[in-house]
Amino acid sequence: MFGKPDKMDVRCHSDAEAARVSKNAHKESRESKGAEGNLPAAFLKEPQGAFSASGAAEDCNKSKSNSAADPDYCRRILVRDAKGSIREIILPKGLDLDRPKRTRTSFTAEQLYRLEMEFQRCQYVVGRERTELARQLNLSETQVKVWFQNRRTKQKKDQGKDSELRSVVSETAATCSVLRLLEQGRLLSPPGLPALLPPCATGALGSALRGPSLPALGAGAAAGSAAAAAAAAPGPAGAASPHPPAVGGAPGPGPAGPGGLHAGAPAAGHSLFSLPVPSLLGSVASRLSSAPLTMAGSLAGNLQELSARYLSSSAFEPYSRTNNKEGAEKKALD
């Protein structure tokens, strides 16, 4: 009777000794993991199996102990990489590797048509309407709900693209308008004074604005003033003419003296509303002849200022550009 317990004790001691030896081997394998690359592969297989079993037990203990403290993670895996080192991989709680991949729903043409018509009518279909629509189309309510969510997202993206395209088009149009105004300003800038004046080949104004006939204009001004004085003088009967001289050379209906017809015709031909035109032209010509270069310089300066204002102003201020342009044109005319 005493021999059997001795054998049992020896067997238990041997089991305990084997467990202690395996633990020591496991500790030594963990301490010497830096030198595992120099050991043969046959020697590394046995500690790896022992470590995997102990690592699995440790993993279970960790998962059980940290389940309440760390609910965001559900699984910790110890793996050995290509270099032989042990690494720990923590998988998130939401990741389910065993779950099959969700299949993509394929709609028929009739289902898409009905869904699109309902979306054009109302972008949010809930409650009984969604249930009835899903029943009519032979779909689930989840499929109908997801389709409407995706359709609303697509519409928002399309609206964003359209607004961006409209902004680009408006900016392009504004840039073109600014460039057009700058081109007009460049074409209006003259090299000299004669480019600004209208081409008057004939007439008293053209002869006055051209510089070589200034002495003739002075003589014409004197003759015009004398003719106007003769027209205003009374006739031989001692009474003045009750009608003013007509414009365009037509003689007035009043009586004319011996020199009245000849005096009235030149006055009518060279006066505009009783104003002597040659004298006016003479004054204009004298001003132009006195400072033509100054006027051309001021015009060029105003046009350069106008171009600078177009460049510095925003493309979305048409009224301010119009006012600046009118002010510059008035300065140029003055």
Curated annotation (Swiss-Prot):
Q: What name does UniProt use for this protein?
A: Ventral anterior homeobox 1
- Predominantly, its location class is nucleus
**Family according to the record:** Belongs to the EMX homeobox family.
CDD domains (UniProt xref): homeodomain (cd00086)
Q: What does this protein do?
A: Transcription factor that may function in dorsoventral specification of the forebrain. Required for axon guidance and major tract formation in the developing forebrain. May contribute to the differentiation of the neuroretina, pigmented epithelium and optic stalk.
This chain's source organism reads Homo sapiens
UniProt-annotated stretches for the region Disordered? 1-41, 234-263, 314-334
Organism superkingdom: Eukaryota
Per the UniProt record, the associated disease is: Microphthalmia, syndromic, 11: A rare clinical entity including as main characteristics microphthalmia and small optic nerves, cleft lip and palate, absence of corpus callosum, hippocampal malformations, and absence of the pineal gland. Microphthalmia is a disorder of eye formation, ranging from small size of a single eye to complete bilateral absence of ocular tissues (anophthalmia). In many cases, microphthalmia/anophthalmia occurs in association with syndromes that include non-ocular abnormalities.
* Cellular compartment(s): Nucleus
**Residue ranges the UniProt entry marks as DNA-binding:** 100-159
Can you cite an annotated GO cellular component?
Answer: nucleus
Q: Which lineage is the organism of this entry classified under, starting from the top rank?
A: Eukaryota, Metazoa, Chordata, Craniata, Vertebrata
